[in-house]
A protein has these predicted regions:
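Signature for HUH/AEP ssDNA processing cores
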Residues: 1-105, 111-132, 232, 296
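A short catalytic or substrate-binding loop motif that flags glycine-/basic-rich loops and adjacent residues
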Residues: 47, 59, 158, 217-218
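Proline-rich low-complexity regions
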Residues: 52, 143, 165, 285-288
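Modules that initiate DNA replication and primer synthesis
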Residues: 72-76, 84-91, 105-127, 168-172, ...
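Catalytic "initiation/cleavage/transfer" segments centered on a nucleophilic residue
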Residues: 137-196
Length: 305
């Protein structure tokens, strides 16, 4: 087995009780109650068929999750997904995510973890990212289920699957932080360097309240809470940059400087809103990733991913 194949299999490992496979005759996916074996994955990478994997495992854990963002049905003909803008947002907040193109031309935004964690915790963190990126959690977020039950016949449920990238080895490709399309080998190396431990990502919980209140001002204020906590000496300038970048595509538009001053900044100057979390601010204020005190991603069994 070549290294990129082994990395792909590990990075997209999920439920072993079944998977989805596309039937070109019906133009639909069928759920197969069988293990997605190495041969099945190889057939996907060779282009023989297209498969989808269920992130949640039989023990209700998951080692990865994905936000499926595909607004094409709400856009005019000829619409092209703004991948460059999405990547700028991810880069700005240093979010631990990688982006691949979906089958329909939208974005699959993936979080990769060093081992399986409770699915509810993985899903909850992905909702935080969806909230700050898109202002809503009303999107398809995988794992969709946080606990697998049993059907009416007493059989164990298998969960919902999501299409895998790189069908045929060269479609639904991954983009790096600069927006460059990556071949399979490059993508597996890139994603392997972005595998994280869930506990190290706790600071990102500040990006949204537990009830995820929608609206431009709510989203911007909560981003401000995060930025003030982790960049206390420069948070006001960062909030202004956040406003221009993240609210450019918001239905309410970018806040004017006057609006920003009289609402978000005024509130944040008066009070700290991060008492519910106990993570420490970064010791090196010049380093936006200094709060990551755990093992570096490159040290987490990179050869296996």
């Amino acid at each position: 087995m070549i290294k990129s194949e082994a990395q792909f299999i590990n990075l997209y490992s999920g439920n072993q009780q079944g998977y989805g496979v596309y039937d070109p005759k019906t133009n639909e996916y069928e759920f197969i109650h069988a293990t997605p074996t190495v041969e099945v994955i190889r057939d996907h990478l060779s282009g023989k068929h297209s498969i989808g994997v269920v992130p949640i495992r039989a023990d209700n854990t998951s080692s990865w999750g994905t936000i499926d963002h595909d607004p094409h049905h709400k856009k005019p003909d000829g619409y092209k997904y703004p991948f460059a803008d999405l990547q700028k947002k991810i880069n700005f907040l240093d979010l631990p995510l990688v982006v691949t193109k979906s089958k329909r031309g939208g974005a699959h935004i993936k979080l990769s973890l060093d081992k399986p964690y409770p699915a509810d915790k993985v899903q909850h963190l992905l909702k935080k990212f969806a909230y700050t990126l898109f202002g809503t959690v009303n999107l398809e977020i995988f794992p969709k289920q946080i606990k697998l039950g049993y059907d009416d016949e007493g059989k164990r449920e298998c969960g919902s699957y999501i299409n895998l990238p790189y069908k045929g080895g060269n479609t639904r490709v991954m983009l790096n932080s600069e927006g460059k399309e990556l071949n399979l080998e490059e993508a597996m190396k890139y994603e392997s360097s972005r595998v994280h431990r869930l506990d190290d990502l706790k600071p990102f919980k500040l990006l949204a309240k537990k009830d995820f209140p929608e609206g431009r001002n709510n989203k911007t204020h909560q981003a401000g809470v995060y930025l003030k906590k982790h960049f206390p000496e420069d948070y006001e300038n960062r909030i202004k940059e956040y406003n221009k970048l993240f609210n450019a595509d918001d239905p309410d538009g970018v806040l004017s400087i006057k609006e920003l001053e009289s609402t978000i900044l005024k509130s944040l100057r008066r009070k700290d809103y991060d008492q519910e979390l106990n993570e420490d601010a970064p010791k090196n204020k010049a380093d936006p990733t200094a709060w990551r005190m755990g093992t570096k991603a490159s040290e987490i069994r990179e050869t296996e991913y």
